[in-house]
């Protein structure tokens, strides 16, 4: 089978992060023949279980949630059409670190973190696992989190650190040649959510009386993963694939409920809210679409 000429690598912390963050973008590029590779850094062992019949899988009981989430992730990837998914270093090499909420509204490290938690991972060792993937897949574009991990989750921050460091190391010819031939990723993006889109969504929900999942957020108090529009550099219009994104999110059945805020936004605003995904460029040169301040293609400007 021929290697796709365009290749996209996404690095995420837990199963479901990919579907929430870039599910529509992934489906769009798969449909266009782009090679899409997802690397998930942990098994999601510490995720909050929202389905009562799976409660026994929690870390303080049977501790089998990772196996269930592995199945859910596989189902989500099937929905999106992604055939190349890997766990960083292999399944359960790194454990979900968990988190707790800070009074300021962002996530911070939990009081009791497992010794094998991703948050405690040796940075070079973890990066080497990803270097090997980068040198094998040879993506032109990589997507991961910003330096705050979107909202402060320790695993998101660590995924950012590992991804950015691995991208540097993978390009160095003399660095561990046993991990493959060097490869320099041309463009790196950090996923983001548009502030104007979020404000419009919350306003619409409040007016319809369905904003119960967004208490505490207003025009001046948006979730920390929301980015003001002037900081965004790319907007991928994947509205034609929004239904796939929603189906992929539903596949993560232990983590996302159909009566939660994600689906409230979808039910009220349709494909508009989840079919457009936004990014900030962290490496490379942005090439905005004609008549726009934003790129409409993550591969824009590349001679792939």
Q: Model-predicted segments: where are they?
A:
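Metal-dependent de-N-acetylase/amidase catalytic core
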Residues: 1-11, 99, 108-304
């Amino acid at each position: 089978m021929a290697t796709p000429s365009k290749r996209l690598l996404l690095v995420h912390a837990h199963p479901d992060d990919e579907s929430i963050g870039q599910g529509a973008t992934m489906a769009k590029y798969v449909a266009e023949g782009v090679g899409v590779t997802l690397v998930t850094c942990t098994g999601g062992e510490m995720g909050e279980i929202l389905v009562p019949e799976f409660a026994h899988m929690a870390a303080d009981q049977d501790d089998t949630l990772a196996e269930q989430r592995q199945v859910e992730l596989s189902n989500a990837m099937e929905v999106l059409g992604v055939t190349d998914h890997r766990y960083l270093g292999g399944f359960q090499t790194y454990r979900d670190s968990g988190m707790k909420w800070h009074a300021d509204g962002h996530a911070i490290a939990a009081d009791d973190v497992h010794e094998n938690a991703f948050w405690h991972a040796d940075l070079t060792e973890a990066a080497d696992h990803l270097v090997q993937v980068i040198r094998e897949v040879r993506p032109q574009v990589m997507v991961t989190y910003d330096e705050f991990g979107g909202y402060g989750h320790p695993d998101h921050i660590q995924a950012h650190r590992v991804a950015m460091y691995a991208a540097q190391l993978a390009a160095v010819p003399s660095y561990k040649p046993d991990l493959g031939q060097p490869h320099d990723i041309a463009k790196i993006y950090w996923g983001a959510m548009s502030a104007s889109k979020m404000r419009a969504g919350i306003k619409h929900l409040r007016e319809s009386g369905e904003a119960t999942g967004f208490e505490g957020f207003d025009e001046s108090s948006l979730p920390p993963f929301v980015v003001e529009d002037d900081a965004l550099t790319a907007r991928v219009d994947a509205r034609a694939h929004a239904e796939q994104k929603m189906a992929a999110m539903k596949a993560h059945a232990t983590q996302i409920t159909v009566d939660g805020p994600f689906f409230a936004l979808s039910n009220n605003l349709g494909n508009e809210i989840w079919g457009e995904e936004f990014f900030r460029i962290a490496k490379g040169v942005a090439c905005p679409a004609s008549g726009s301040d934003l790129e409409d293609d993550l591969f824009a400007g590349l001679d792939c």
